[in-house]
A protein has these predicted regions:
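N-terminal interaction/assembly modules
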Residues: 1-104, 108-148
Length: 148
């Protein structure tokens, strides 16, 4: 989260890899999960346009440039986990984002994050959510035959 914040705060002009290396060296020398940190950061970076479009669609009261940088990057992480990471269950992704928001954001950040990502989650089809296997999703034909 801190690496994405710094990268975004500096208008994405700095090298994300260098920021990550510095933060891991400074804050996470003994931390496990370094690969996961890189997966999250690069995943957000590589899908930034799509993720930001989702934020714009679901945070209609807030233009992107008016969303505080902490909130914006917590949303990006949460949406990336929800939409792209199969190993993270959807409700875990939402909860982690809300808790990050409460920890690093302002007084109402947790509620804001929960509102945006929670609304997105409710709108998604099961096959659209990374933590739900496609085999769990039901197609419309299957639903219509189950009703009869």
């Amino acid at each position: 989260m801190q690496s994405l914040f710094e990268w975004d705060f500096n208008e994405r002009k700095e090298n994300l890899e260098e920021i990550l290396k510095n933060h891991i060296q400074e804050f996470g020398k003994e931390a496990q999960g370094e690969e996961f940190v890189y997966e999250l950061a690069y995943g957000v970076r590589d899908n930034l346009a799509a993720i930001d479009e989702i934020i714009i669609k679901h945070a209609t009261e807030w233009p992107m440039d008016q969303i505080p940088p902490v909130d914006r990057n917590v949303l990006r992480l949460g949406i990336f986990e929800l939409m792209f990471l199969k190993q993270v269950p959807p409700k875990v992704a939402i909860n982690e984002a809300v808790e990050l928001g409460k920890t690093f954001g302002g007084e109402s950040t947790g509620k804001f994050i929960n509102g945006v990502i929670g609304t997105l989650y409710k709108e998604l089809e099961p096959a659209d959510i990374a933590g739900v296997e496609n085999s769990e999703a039901k197609d419309p034909e299957q639903l219509s035959t189950e009703k009869t």
